[in-house]
Amino acid sequence: MAEIVAAAGVPHTPAFPGLVAREGPDSETAQLYGQIRAHLEEADVLVMFDSDHLNTFFFDNLPALSVPLAASAPGTNDGTPGMNNRTVPLAAGLGTEVLAGLTERGYYPSRTAKLSMDHSVMVPLHFLDPGERMTLLPIYLNGLAPPLPGAARCLALGADVGAIVEAWDSPLKVALVASGSFSLEVGGPRIADNAIAGVPDVEWVKHVSQRLKQGQAAELVAEATSDRMRAAGNVGGELLNWIALLGAVGPRPVEVLEQQAHLGHSYAAWTWS
C-alpha cells in the first residue's frame, strides 16, 4: 500500500520565483522553502490541497471540490514571472481512487479530465520539486468565491483523503501539501494605494500560526467561519487548504513552523516517522 511520509503547508506568492532568481539561494524565501523541501525528499507523489485563482476554473463552472483525472497538465497558465512553463505529470491513478473514495464517503467532487494550472500550484511545485521528479495530484477546494465550503467539512475531507491515500494499492510514497495564505487581499479595497495585494489582518496570521503550533485543529475550525476568513482578505479562504491538511495530519505535532505574519502566511512541515 502507499505510504504517507510527510505533510507541509506553504504560500504560493507569484512574485517568489522571480525574487529568488534575483536574490539567489541565500534569500529568506529560498531558505524557508528549502526547510520544507527537506521534509519531502522521500516522496514520489505530492497531493496538494489548493484553491484555484479563477484560472483553471471560472464562475461559469466553479466546483467546491474537484479532483483531476488527467495524466498531465501544463502550467503556469497565468504568466507567473521567473518560471518556465512545463507539463506536469499527474497521479491519475490516485486521482481515480480519491474521486471514488470521496464519493463513497458522501462528498460530491467534480472530475476534471483536462486542465491547466496557475501559480497556486506551480509556485509550490517550483520550490518543493525543483528536480521535477514527483507526480502531482492537486485537489481543488473553492477558497475564493462565496459560498465557501465549511471548515469542519474540509477537516473531515482531509482525514478521508489521508485514509484513501493509505489504502491505495501502490508502493509509492506520498506527501500532502497545503497551498495558500491566511490573510491576503488581492486587488481589493483593503490594500495600500498603488499596491496589487496586501495583508489586512496580521493578527489573524499570528493566531492561526499559534493554533498550528499547538495542534489545535478543532479550535481553528470553530473560528474559521466564512465571515472570519473573508475578513482576513478576499482570498482568506485559502486557509481551508491548511485545515484539510490538518485533517490528514491528525494529532501529529508540527516539526517546522516559520511565520511571516507581515506577508500573510507561514511555512510548516510534519513527518510521519
Where does each model-flagged region fall?
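Glycine-rich His-Gly loop
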Residues: H12-T13, S51-H53
